[in-house]
Amino acid sequence: MFHGTTILCVRRDGKVAIASDGQVSLEKTVMKNTAKKVRRLGEGQVLAGFAGSTADAFTLFERFEAKLKEHQKNMARACVELGKDWRTDRFLRRLEALLIVADKEKTFILSGAGDVIEPDYGIAAVGSGGPYAFAAARALMAHTQMSARDVVHQSLTIAGEIDIYTNANISIEEL
């Protein structure tokens, strides 16, 4: 089973940034250090990141992008519809991945159970290093004036120093 990762999304001052580490592990072995787990969807208007099985995440990215097109780039509606499909489709129910998606206005976490969660604090984090990145981001948001981009970078750096499944090869996308 592929293990761990860290995806973090932060909103601040009208900007949204999403970041991931680059490590892919298989049991106790690092298989890749430079994986790109965040990307732009919906003609560049939606940011997305995944934790979990890579093949499953690509399947979900494709399904999510199809929902975005179907619902005229209404990200919230696309999330709800993908969540419904995830709960009812036998194939999708077997997928092991979590997604964070964000546009200029909203952020959602899509869980493997088909849940669609809009997180508090303007911060969303998933993966094995998610709790560490989330805590670091909350502290940085409360006690600094750092930009969203700088918060995700510094928070992932901290998570990578704590979580063995998170490395310091950070990819960031921003709107």
Curated annotation (Swiss-Prot):
EC number: 3.4.25.2
Transmembrane portions of the chain: none
GO biological process: proteolysis involved in protein catabolic process
Keywords: Allosteric enzyme, Cytoplasm, Hydrolase, Metal-binding, Protease, Sodium, Stress response, Threonine protease
Example GO molecular function: metal ion binding
Places the protein is found: Cytoplasm
List of residues binding Na(+): G160, D163, T166
Assigned GO CC terms: HslUV protease complex; proteasome core complex
SUPFAM superfamilies (UniProt xref): N-terminal nucleophile aminohydrolases (Ntn hydrolases)
Active site: T5
Record field: catalytic activity: ATP-dependent cleavage of peptide bonds with broad specificity
Regulation: Allosterically activated by HslU binding.
Lineage top rank: taxon: Bacteria
Assembly and binders: A double ring-shaped homohexamer of HslV is capped on each side by a ring-shaped HslU homohexamer. The assembly of the HslU/HslV complex is dependent on binding of ATP.
Function per UniProt: Protease subunit of a proteasome-like degradation complex believed to be a general protein degrading machinery.
Family: Belongs to the peptidase T1B family. HslV subfamily.
Protein name (record): ATP-dependent protease subunit HslV
Organism annotation: Myxococcus xanthus (strain DK1622)
Gene: hslV
